[in-house]
Structures are given as structure tokens and as C-alpha cells.
């Protein structure tokens, strides 16, 4: 069966037996198979799981204590070493606190991108280098191709599982050290390979939830930052008060359910104002836009965005199939995106990821 899972050498001019690969193991199917496959192919695998938070439920998330046990069991079955690193402090300070701060600013965060950006691909990558390993490997569904000293990043062959959206903030320097061996395969075949290796996680469900949110965002924020929950007014687009809310952290742009108001026509959250603590609601027509602004751009291409604009495809959320757009550069690492032939809900705090076909060019944060 291994003949169906051929991968190119992960390090140029170096055999698998001479290559030390640290594999970031979340305890799920994908990273477990990535580690097991490389071990079978002769790589010197070291499995590392990050302890990020205190959660023993293991329900629909990742990197909890039960997931650490699963990762250790996989390593034991396959016969390669496994270690757990405690990153709870940095995860709390740079991911969880940022998650709460972003909601308090009236934006909708994506903590998984932040975790990749600062914990996995900064701190874990540095730890990998300190072990004198050659590469850091993950189970993400994304493709990376190196050619003539250039790095090209593409969406996964399995478009339903593609995770390029969540990795847009990964820098070229980080990508030089990272490897994604599952990018050319489909998830169904990865599960079959897990069964072939007799791994106990072969039928483990995919993680769906934000790992540190045990039940709801509101309860998590209220527990960690009680002063973030402040009552305020719900107003219409003309400024008329329609009712009250229990905190803007309970809302996101485009939200329809849970507003707490009755109306003949559906009402949507149009705007969140943290300065006045007001939630503006209105009809769907007031929600759709064809222009947005992005900041803190991570650009993976040598050529800069031309001032005349660049024709691209953009994804405004992970499940978004993509919209054609023109991107115009601005000062201070910002850009303006004009959607072509479509209007979308634009949610500050989310990512706008930019593609040329299936090649990821980079992206930025919607502001």
C-alpha cells in the first residue's frame, strides 16, 4: 500500500535515513499518519505534541490531554520517540488573550491562524532547530514546491480539506523549514493508511471546534475576562434604539440568529462599535459589500502587487469557494480589494487570502 503514497525527498540531496524530521502531532489522524508514513519511509522521526491548554474533554478539538495520549500511543506503536512541550503560557498570552481582545474590538478572530503563526511556526520551529532537526513536518493539507530557490504554495489536491487559508501568515523563512507531505493526497486515503498501520486513531473524527472553547465563546470569554461582557444598545442603521444586548462579544458581522429582536423581515448584524458598545442591525442589503481593506499583509511572491492592480481570486473565510477580485496596494503594508461580479459579507478580524488559480500568493487581515 505504501507504493500509493510516494513523496519526493523532503530534503534536497539528503536521504531519508540521514534526515531528522520533527513532526507536530496533534493527536489526530492527519499528523499521526504523516509521522507514521515518514517513519516507514526511513526518516528519523521525532514526534512532538504541544500542551496548549487544560482541557480533558477531547470533544471536537485538538491538542488536549486525550490527544496527547493518542499521539504518544501512535509513536509507541510505530517505534519513534515522542515528547510533549508545555506552551500553555505563550498560548494564553498570544492566542487566547488575542482572541478575547479581538472580540472586544468588535471583530471576529481566527485563533487557529494565530496559533500557526506564533506558536507552531515560530516557537515549535525554533525548538525543532534546537534539536538539530532538518525539517518540521505537519499534517496540513497544503502543497509546497521549491524550484530554483523559489517557494510556491498551492492549495491541497483534496479541495474539501484544503488548509491553505489557515496558513497564509506563514513566512517564506518559515516555509523553507516546513514540509507538508499530505498535500497531494485525499483524506479518505489517509484514513485507509491509518488503518493499514493499525493506528487506533484511524476513525477519530476531525477536529471541528476552537480547542480552548469548551462550550460557547460567550462562556469562555466571561470566564477568562469577566469585564468583557458589558450590556449596551442594539440600534438600527438610523440610530434608533431597538433593544439591548449582553455584550458585543456575542455578535459577529452578518449574524442573524440570537439577536433577540422580533421583526417582520430578518435582521442581520451590520456593525459593531466597541467605542459606544452598540450593535447595529439592518436588512441584508445593508450587509453586502464589494470593497474591503486588509492589513498586516504576508506576501509570498517576489513581485510586489502593482499599483495598477492585480487580478486574483480571494477567499474571505475558510469555506469560501473564492471570488474574483482586483487587489490594489496601499501604504503601511495594507491593500484595497475590489470584488468583481459579487457582493459578500465582509467581517473584520477574518482573513482575506489571495490566490492565482490554486497558488496561494499571500493574504492579510480584514480591517
From Swiss-Prot:
It catalyses: S-sulfanyl-L-cysteinyl-[protein] + uridine(34) in tRNA + AH2 + ATP = 2-thiouridine(34) in tRNA + L-cysteinyl-[protein] + A + AMP + diphosphate + H(+). GO terms for cellular component: cytoplasm. Residues 161-163 are annotated as: Interaction with tRNA. ATP binds at residues 24-31, 50, 139. Signal peptide: none annotated. It holds the Pfam family tRNA_Me_trans. Keywords: ATP-binding, Cytoplasm, Disulfide bond, Nucleotide-binding, RNA-binding, Transferase, tRNA processing, tRNA-binding. The record marks 140, 350 as: Interaction with tRNA. It is found in: Cytoplasm. One of its GO terms (biological process) is tRNA wobble position uridine thiolation. InterPro entries: MnmA-like (IPR004506), MnmA-like_C (IPR046885), MnmA-like_central (IPR046884), MnmA-like_central_sf (IPR023382), Rossmann-like_a/b/a_fold (IPR014729). Its EC number is 2.8.1.13. The active site is at residues 115, 211. The keyword Calcium does not apply. It is an enzyme of class 2 (transferase). GO terms for molecular function: ATP binding; tRNA binding; tRNA-uridine 2-sulfurtransferase activity. Disulfide bonds join 115-211. Belongs to the MnmA/TRMU family. PANTHER family: MITOCHONDRIAL TRNA-SPECIFIC 2-THIOURIDYLASE 1, TRNA 5-METHYLAMINOMETHYL-2-THIOURIDYLATE -METHYLTRANSFERASE. Catalyzes the 2-thiolation of uridine at the wobble position (U34) of tRNA, leading to the formation of s(2)U34. This is tRNA-specific 2-thiouridylase MnmA. It comes from Ehrlichia chaffeensis (strain ATCC CRL-10679 / Arkansas). The gene is mnmA.
Amino acid at each position: 500500500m505504501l507504493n500509493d503514497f510516494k513523496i519526493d525527498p523532503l530534503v534536497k540531496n539528503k536521504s531519508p535515513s540521514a534526515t531528522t524530521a520533527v513532526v507536530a502531532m496533534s493527536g489526530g489522524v492527519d499528523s499521526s499518519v504523516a509521522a507514521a508514513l515518514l517513519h516507514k519511509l526511513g526518516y528519523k522521526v521525532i514526534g512532538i505534541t504541544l500542551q496548549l491548554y487544560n482541557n480533558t474533554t477531547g470533544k471536537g478539538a485538538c491538542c488536549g490531554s486525550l490527544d496527547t495520549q493518542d499521539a504518544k500511543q501512535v509513536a509507541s506503536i510505530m517505534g519513534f520517540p515522542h515528547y510533549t512541550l508545555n506552551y500553555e503560557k505563550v498560548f494564553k498570552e498570544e492566542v487566547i488573550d488575542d482572541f478575547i481582545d479581538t472580540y472586544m474590538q468588535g471583530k471576529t478572530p481566527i485563533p487557529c491562524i494565530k496559533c500557526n503563526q506564533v506558536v507552531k511556526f515560530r516557537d515549535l520551529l525554533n525548538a525543532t532547530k534546537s534539536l538539530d532537526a532538518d525539517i518540521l513536518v505537519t499534517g496540513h493539507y497544503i502543497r509546497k514546491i521549491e524550484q530554483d530557490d523559489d517557494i510556491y504554495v498551492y492549495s491541497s489536491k483534496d479541495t474539501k480539506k484544503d488548509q491553505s487559508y489557515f496558513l497564509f501568515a506563514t513566512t517564506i523563512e518559515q516555509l523553507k523549514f516546513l514540509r507538508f507531505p499530505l498535500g497531494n493526497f485525499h483524506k479518505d486515503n489517509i484514513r485507509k493508511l491509518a488503518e493499514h498501520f493499525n493506528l487506533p486513531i484511524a476513525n477519530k473524527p476531525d477536529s471541528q471546534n476552537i480547542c480552548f472553547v469548551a462550550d460557547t465563546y460567550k462562556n469562555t470569554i466571561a470566564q477568562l475576562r469577566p469585564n468583557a461582557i458589558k450590556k449596551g444598545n442594539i440600534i438600527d442603521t438610523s440610530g434608533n434604539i431597538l433593544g439591548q444586548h449582553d455584550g458585543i462579544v456575542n455578535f459577529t458581522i452578518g449574524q442573524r440568529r440570537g439577536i433577540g429582536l422580533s421583526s417582520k423581515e430578518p435582521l442581520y448584524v451590520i456593525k459593531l462599535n466597541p467605542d459606544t458598545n452598540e450593535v447595529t442591525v439592518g436588512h441584508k442589503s445593508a450587509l453586502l459589500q464589494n470593497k474591503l481593506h486588509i492589513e498586516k499583509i504576508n506576501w509570498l511572491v517576489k513581485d510586489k502587487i502593482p499599483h495598477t492592480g492585480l487580478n486574483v481570486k480571494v477567499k474571505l473565510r475558510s469555506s469560501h469557494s473564492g471570488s474574483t477580485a482586483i487587489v490594489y496596494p496601499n501604504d503601511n503594508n495594507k491593500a484595497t480589494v475590489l470584488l468583481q461580479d459579487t457582493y459578500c459579507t465582509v467581517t473584520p478580524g477574518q482573513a482575506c487570502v489571495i490566490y492565482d488559480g490554486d497558488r496561494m500568493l499571500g493574504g492579510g487581515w480584514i480591517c
